Amino acid sequence: MFYPHHQSQQSTTTNPSKHHDSQDVRLPGTSSWSRHPSHPSFTPSLPMPSPSGYPPLGSGYPPGGHHHPNVNVHSGIHGPHPSFGSGMGGNGGMGHGQGFGMGMFQNGVQTSPPRGEPVPMTSHWQTQMMRAEASRSASSPHHRARAAAISSRATNKPSAVPIVDPNNRPSSSYGTNGLHRKNASSVFNGEPTGTPPLSDPSLTPAQNPAEPATPAPVAGQTESKDEEKPNEPWTGLDLGGIRLKRLSTALFSFTHVTSLYINHNALTSIPSAISSLRQLTLLDATGNELSTIPSEIGVLSKLKDLLLFDNNLTTLPFELGTLYQLDCLGIDGNPMNADYRKKLVEDGTRGLITYLRDHAPPPPPPPERQWIDLETDVDTPTSGKQESFSVLTYNILCASFAPATTYSYTPSWALDWDYRKRLLLEEIVTASADVVCLQEIDCKQYADYFYPMLKKEGYEGQHYPRSRAKTMSVDEQKLVDGCATFWKEEKFRLVETQVIEFNQLALQKTDMRTEDMFNRVMSRDNIAVVAALEFRASGGRLLVANSHIYWDHRYRDVKLVQIGMLMEELEKIVEQFSRYPVKLDTDPEYNNGKPPKYERSEKGRDIPLIMCVDLNSFSGSAVYDYLSSGSIPGDHEDFMSHLYGRYTASGLKHHLGLRSACAGIGEMRMTNFTPTFAAAIDYVFYTPRTMKVTSVLGDVDKAYLDKTVGFPNAHFPSDHIPVFTQFRIKGHLDPLPLNGDPYH
């Protein structure tokens, strides 16, 4: 990466202070910035086990009297062996073994299971035993597929058999989908359910919670982290009970599969390519000869059932700690590590997963992010020496927006604010950008930590909280987040700062006092902070806007209105800025010794403008297109038939001539990364008439991301990454088209 990342030692939740007992800016240990299957059975969305995981046709054979000759029959064992499960006779004469490999080893030889110390029959272990018995009862070849076919033939209405994933149960209460403080009714597994009807009561301000910071996916666009779902009629794959010895890698091309049964075979390993099956919610590998499982299973963050009963496993990879939605981890029938078994008995699957997560050593840091050069950063004889400067924008994930229940895939020590804030500061200081724009920074952290620490590094800054802070007590105000802008004092002089409060602007617009404006816009307290700066050496001017737009894709109209109001205000501010007297005492090296000059006829559009924004929208969205093209028609679908006076009567239009700094590389692959969402939603816009982008900091290494569930983690302290760009003032103003429109 471009900046160093802390390679902390193995940590535990019992001693978190080791990660944050110092206020030093530098962190120790940092670097400088600078098959086709042999016998496949494809079934139409196997009803396979019921949502509880138990066989739909009982624990014996399905109707038809199939008999599996290699299954040992046990009867009436009322006290299941605490370490290796129990063997109970099944209905219809089917029995099943116990111990490693279902009481079966190579060539079908049956053995007696080893004995171990009794295990307390806690509720967690009772659940474990019930799930083990359900899996052991499915040892016949393609048991689930046959059961599904019989179930389908048993009805006179085949169409009544739902083509759905039987394991697609509601999300576990242990954690959320990684989008903090999201309305769960609007997103499932990160996919939009579409725009709710206008009568949806969830749209009223009283029932909609305060704004979170991470976006939900935009309606009409699939979740970027998952491939579009193919039109496959099946999502379950049953390869169970056919004595497979290995799995072909071709199997893992079926990336839409949600349930994979490879139980009761002779597998000694699972290929690491299983990491391709990102949609898996159930993996049953019961009754094999596995001595290890691949750490890559840890990236299958949608898993709810991982059944590994009756194998030869002695330990589990720490990477399973990121399976934050896992409801059942089946380990009975394995010579498992005593500590892991005890943890599961006492605290259940969630307790064991949390233990693995918090005791995992930090993974290797990613490679440095690489700079991508776009234009040369050189002076020309005609323009003379011109100013170069760098801009960094960063949503730092406010501490109050990062509860452990939301980011349950993140180790507790890495989610701890004291650890995160030190790593955030390290990134900012090492980047050493001339202008730094932060979103989601609360009043307390600005005043007590970031401002004083960055002051030592030569920065000055301004911070404004959201509008709600005005109605709160002093203590409550400290926890309200907002936007902060920092600049290097040796390079810039502050002329003035302004805060733009969107709900207050909405109140002032008498020609737009519609019901939708009151109910949808005025209840959102997003803001923008504008800093008017002057280069100390050349006397040139720079306007920096820093904003955080509303997140919810169901309120795309609100986003448009907020951006429309922001552009109107920026046009007023730049015009006012152009009327300031010109600085005459400048360095003669710059601009061929001439003081900067701004024409009144340009109305401030000849002043370089930077807009750093967490837009909470993809490139190609209405708000992005509006900023980049200068106009949006009033009947645009993203207004969602709501009425906003002249905005919806005649559309939105601005004349600032903006362009995204990363447009030259097709935008970043992502700037926000969680288990259910990965997309670019943070941007730096600029005015190409007055300056050029010389370079941008590239994406995070893809190989690293492929092994990572989401941010924050040990190396990335926020669920966002910073967007970092280098600019150069042109020293001349590109001419406008004949119609005077900078976009046409």
From Swiss-Prot:
Q: Please give a single GO biological process term from the UniProt record.
A: nuclear-transcribed mRNA poly(A) tail shortening
Q: What class of enzyme is it?
A: hydrolase
Instruction: Report keywords, A-Z.
Output: Cytoplasm, Exonuclease, Hydrolase, Leucine-rich repeat, Magnesium, Metal-binding, Nuclease, Nucleus, Repeat, RNA-binding, Transcription, Transcription regulation
**SMART domains, per the entry:** LRR_TYP
Q: What is its EC number?
A: 3.1.13.4
The listed locations are:
Cytoplasm; Nucleus
Give a short account of what the protein does.
Acts as a catalytic component of the CCR4-NOT core complex, which in the nucleus seems to be a general transcription factor, and in the cytoplasm the major mRNA deadenylase involved in mRNA turnover. Ccr4 has 3'-5' RNase activity with a strong preference for polyadenylated substrates and also low exonuclease activity towards single-stranded DNA.
Instruction: Quote the catalytic activity from the record.
Output: Exonucleolytic cleavage of poly(A) to 5'-AMP
Q: What is its main location?
A: cytoplasm
Polar residues: which segments have biased composition? 1-16, 29-43
Residue sites binding Mg(2+) per the record: 440
One Gene Ontology term, aspect cellular component: nucleus
Q: Which organism's genome codes for this protein?
A: Cryptococcus neoformans var. neoformans serotype D (strain JEC21 / ATCC MYA-565)
Put simply, this protein is called CCR4-Not complex 3'-5'-exoribonuclease subunit Ccr4
This protein's encoding gene: CCR4
Which Pfam families is this protein grouped with?
A: Exo_endo_phos (PF03372), LRR_8 (PF13855)
Task: Give start-end positions of Gly residues composition bias.
Answer: 86-100
Transcription keyword on record = yes
Q: Which CDD domains match?
A: Deadenylase_CCR4
